[in-house]
């Protein structure tokens, strides 16, 4: 995988102070985004980040099951089991899920980008999207390695099915294209079916989402 690994947030984020009729209160930027029904996935996808995303999706559904949720993605990918946990939650909750790539959506993150509600999947102009086969390492006794090999084949087939479902490509095409890293520009990702539109402003995203509603 190209790049420098998982992006890391600064240890100390500046708080945002809001003034209301009840006085002032402060919150971190992620809480402010959540208030606006935005989930930000800006780290490697693992059990911790997956649980965070799932909890936010379920919370926002309970707050208003009829309003869209946006997931902003800048992630190098990560664990396949963590991917499927987020993916299944996205399909489970009632609100439409708008996905927006800001920077990169690689590997597992590319699947989540594609899994947004049709017509509401976007990427900023200079985004980078990468798809490839899930990877795993076999260790242990020969019988264990055989079990792991079968699991690798199952996982690869499942990812091919997911990408085929959301891109309109055949599973055969997906299998061929993920034999090695396949890197897309934002425009190429749109042509492939991973996203619906390349956008340059929030206003454009809102107009396109309204049009597809």
UniProtKB/Swiss-Prot annotation:
Gene3D superfamilies: 2-enoyl-CoA Hydratase, Chain A, domain 1. Its EC number is 3.4.21.92. The keyword Protease applies. InterPro entries: ClpP, ClpP/crotonase-like_dom_sf, ClpP/TepA, ClpP_His_AS, ClpP_Ser_AS. It holds the Pfam family CLP_protease. It is found in: Cytoplasm. Signal peptide: none annotated. Transmembrane segments: none annotated. Fourteen ClpP subunits assemble into 2 heptameric rings which stack back to back to give a disk-like structure with a central cavity, resembling the structure of eukaryotic proteasomes. Cleaves peptides in various proteins in a process that requires ATP hydrolysis. Has a chymotrypsin-like activity. Plays a major role in the degradation of misfolded proteins. This is ATP-dependent Clp protease proteolytic subunit 3. It comes from Frankia casuarinae (strain DSM 45818 / CECT 9043 / HFP020203 / CcI3).
């Amino acid at each position: 995988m190209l790049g420098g690994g998982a992006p890391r947030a600064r240890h100390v984020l500046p708080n945002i102070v809001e003034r209301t009729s009840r006085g002032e209160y402060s919150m971190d930027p992620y809480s402010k985004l959540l208030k606006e029904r935005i989930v930000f996935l800006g780290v490697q996808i693992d059990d911790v980040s997956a649980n965070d995303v799932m909890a936010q999706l379920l919370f926002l559904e309970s707050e208003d099951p009829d309003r869209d949720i946006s997931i902003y993605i800048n992630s190098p990918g990560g664990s396949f089991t963590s991917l499927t946990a987020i993916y299944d939650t996205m399909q489970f909750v009632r609100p439409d899920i708008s996905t927006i790539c800001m920077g990169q959506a690689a590997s597992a993150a590319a699947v989540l980008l594609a899994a947004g509600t049709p017509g509401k999947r976007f990427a900023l102009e200079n985004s980078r999207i990468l798809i490839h086969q899930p990877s795993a390492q076999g260790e242990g006794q020969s019988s264990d390695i055989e079990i792991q090999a079968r699991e690798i084949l199952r996982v690869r087939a499942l990812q091919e099915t997911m990408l085929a479902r959301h891109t309109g490509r055949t599973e055969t095409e997906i299998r061929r294209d993920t034999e090695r890293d396949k890197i897309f520009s934002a425009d190429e990702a749109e042509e492939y079916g991973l996203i619906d539109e390349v956008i340059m402003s929030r206003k454009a995203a809102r107009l396109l989402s309204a049009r597809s509603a």
